[in-house]
C-alpha cells in the first residue's frame, strides 16, 4: 500500500516512545523533546535530499504549531500558512493540520482549512500510536495532500501563483 519512497522517508524519521499529551504535564515535556528530535531529523533529511518544504514553530507549551509550507508546481513555488493544535487526547488523536487560506477551495478540506486525512492517514496513525508524531503527520499527511491537491487547484485556476497575480 505504501510506495518505496514513502517507506524510506518513514524509516528515516525517528519513532517516538512516550505516550503523553498536553494534559500529562511532566510526561508531555518528555514527549515534546522526542517530537522535536524527530522533526529536526526529518527536516535535515529533507534538506539533504533537496526536498525542503516546510517550517514549523510552536508556542512555549508545544500545544499550538504554526509556520509555512510550500509546494513547487511547474517550477513555481506556492507557499501557504500552516497551523494546528495538539489535541488533548494526543497521541491517540492525530493533529488536524490546517491551511487557512485554502479554506473552501477544495472538497478535500473541512471548515477552517483543515485538510481531509480521514481515509488514508488516520487509520495508519491509529495503528502506530504512540510511535508517530508531528513529523509523521507532515510526511504522511500534509506532504501527500499538497502533492495531490495543489497541482489540481492550479490547473483549475482556483489558486494562482502570487507573481502572476501581482503582474496582471
From Swiss-Prot:
Keywords: Ubl conjugation pathway. Signal peptide: none annotated. GO terms for molecular function: UFM1 conjugating enzyme activity; UFM1 transferase activity. It comes from the Eukaryota. Gene3D superfamilies: Ubiquitin Conjugating Enzyme. InterPro entries: UBQ-conjugating_enzyme/RWD, Ufc1. The active site is at residue 116. GO terms for biological process: protein ufmylation; response to endoplasmic reticulum stress; reticulophagy. This is Ubiquitin-fold modifier-conjugating enzyme 1. E2-like enzyme which forms an intermediate with UFM1 via a thioester linkage. The keyword Chloroplast does not apply. It comes from Trichoplax adhaerens. Belongs to the ubiquitin-conjugating enzyme family. UFC1 subfamily.
